[in-house]
From Swiss-Prot:
Protein name per Swiss-Prot or TrEMBL: Glandular kallikrein, prostatic
Species of the source: Cavia porcellus
Domain Peptidase S1 residues, every copy: 1-236
Glycosylation sites: N78, N169
Listed GO CC annotations: secretory granule
Transmembrane parts of this sequence: none
Amino acid sequence: VIGGQECARDSHPWQAAVYYYSDIKCGGVLVDPQWVLTAAHCINDSNQVKLGRHNLFEDEDTAQHFLVSQSVPHPDFNMSLLEPHNVLPNEDYSHDLMLLRLNQPAQITDSVQVMPLPTQEVQVGTTCRALGWGSIDPDPAHPVFPDELQCVGLEILPSKNCDDAHIANVTGTMLCAGDLAGGKDTCVGDSGGPLICDGVLQGLTSWGDSPCGVAHSPSLYTKVIEYREWIERTMADNP
């Protein structure tokens, strides 16, 4: 998170940390005691999930640690985009979401809570907050990762603001959010984490420019409400 600040410790009980072995790779959101929603591009063969975390380098008695028993990326996400390649015009990062089934249900506590799925669309002009343990330095070649979860206020912008800024496709299944003045953004390591608007989960951090936080180059977030039925059906079909 660029241009943000440490989140209040007890303000994010649904925030998940998605690990590859011992390295945090992405954020996520607890949407059911046994399911975490994250970005499809966070997929790997050994995801683990930590809940109830705030400072990743402190021993926190609120923490709960899980293995992932099943990873279900959205079937329409183009996995070939994950191979190293030069970005081409009109690449399409749509459907960038994935459900992770925990090896056992989370214990619901003050520090670990389920976030409901959205029931109505967010309006352009709404100020939302993005959360993550991603880089606080905008230069992707030299990321600087914070100990504590960071929060930043970002505005929901017209899709045209993103369309004008990026060569990859901007579609109706994405939210465009940021600060046109620059200096506030999500960044590498924030992927899959939540964009919360008026207390409602509306987006998952998906993709953006490099470096992060450039003026007139807002980032893209998977529009969760577009996938509500898929999320509910996937959880129901894999009890």
